[in-house]
């Protein structure tokens, strides 16, 4: 249940509902009472953070990193997103409260908003919490999420076209003559799952059968990444290319290949994802799918404020571009 739903039932605007539930004297008492009783009958919870924002009290946006236990907050892509968000929040004259939550502490997201600690939430990543995020949206918790746009999502999402990115990366490798293409990414996560869909589509179009031995489940920013890579390479499987779902994984792979005297790109071509700053400075420079991090922060803040105002939910899909460098040529 969202503020726009109550507005539709009451025959008023979302801003009128917002003012009525915050006790604004600008709304006639009879109207305030009618809207308040309707909201109570529907078990709609007033967002203390949003009410405080309207009164000018709360000047803080909560930024939540949904992290696996092994994921490092120092991951370059996460740091890039945080930097972009900080700039966008500062432009609004507000502050940022950063929290790192695991699946077992997910209920803190709701309490952060309902207690008035923050105005709304910007959530980085979805992990396997898609249904929980939907529940929060139905409770009227204002938020915007960085991740994959899913068909049944009730919350606004900002992200790149992950399926297209996976398709472009794999098609490029196929065009270079590759046929035994390994995929590195944890497909239980929505973003990596969509990238694998694009990878599989490109392989199918080229008439290349997927080899399950070349599909490796690696978490974004896993601290045990190098250990896992070494274990996989020690199997001595036949492959001529690798598409990794993050640049950090791709760069780690290139280091492991170099230690085994396997040359990139003459023996194995490598493509990453994200286009972090380091991607163009490693040797050889890394071909990657660029996510426009600089645009992400502003888009997330815009959607979060729209959610606070009770505006209809929408998604923003940022441009997805393959950046070709030496690692795949």
Regions found by a protein language model. Name each.
Residues 1-59, 329:
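N-terminal helix-turn-helix DNA-binding module of bacterial transcription factors
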Residues 13, 59, 119, 178-180, ...:
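Short acidic/polar active-site loop segments enriched in Thr and Asp
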């Amino acid at each position: 249940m969202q503020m726009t739903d109550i507005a539709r039932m009451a025959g008023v605007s979302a801003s009128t509902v917002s003012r009525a539930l915050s006790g604004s004297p600008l709304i006639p008492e009879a109207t305030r009472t009618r809207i308040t009783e309707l909201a109570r009958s529907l078990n709609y919870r007033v967002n203390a953070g949003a009410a405080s924002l309207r009164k000018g009290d709360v000047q803080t946006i909560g930024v939540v990193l949904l992290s696996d236990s092994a994921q490092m907050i120092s991951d370059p892509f996460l740091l890039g997103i945080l930097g972009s968000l900080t700039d966008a929040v500062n432009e609004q004259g507000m502050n940022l409260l950063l929290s790192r939550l695991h699946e077992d502490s997910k209920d803190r997201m709701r309490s952060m908003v309902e207690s008035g600690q923050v105005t709304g939430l910007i959530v980085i990543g979805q992990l396997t919490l898609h249904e929980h995020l939907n529940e929060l949206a139905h409770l009227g918790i204002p938020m915007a999420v960085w991740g994959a746009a899913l068909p049944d999502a009730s919350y606004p999402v900002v992200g790149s076209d992950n399926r297209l990115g996976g398709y472009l990366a794999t098609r490029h490798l196929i065009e270079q003559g590759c046929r035994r293409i390994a995929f590195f990414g944890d497909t239980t996560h929505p973003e990596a799952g969509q990238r694998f869909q694009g990878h599989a589509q490109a392989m199918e179009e080229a008439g290349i059968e997927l080899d399950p031995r070349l599909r490796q489940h690696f978490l974004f920013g896993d601290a045990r990444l190098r250990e896992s890579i070494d274990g996989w390479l020690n199997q001595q499987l036949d492959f001529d290319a690798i598409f990794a779902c993050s640049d950090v994984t791709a760069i780690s792979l290139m280091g492991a290949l170099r230690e085994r005297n396997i040359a990139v790109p003459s023996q194995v071509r490598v493509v990453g994802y994200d286009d972090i700053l380091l991607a163009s400075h490693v040797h050889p420079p890394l071909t990657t799918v660029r996510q426009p991090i600089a645009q992400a922060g502003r888009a997330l803040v815009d959607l979060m404020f729209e959610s606070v105002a009770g505006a209809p939910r929408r998604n923003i899909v940022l441009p997805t571009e393959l950046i070709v460098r030496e690692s795949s040529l």
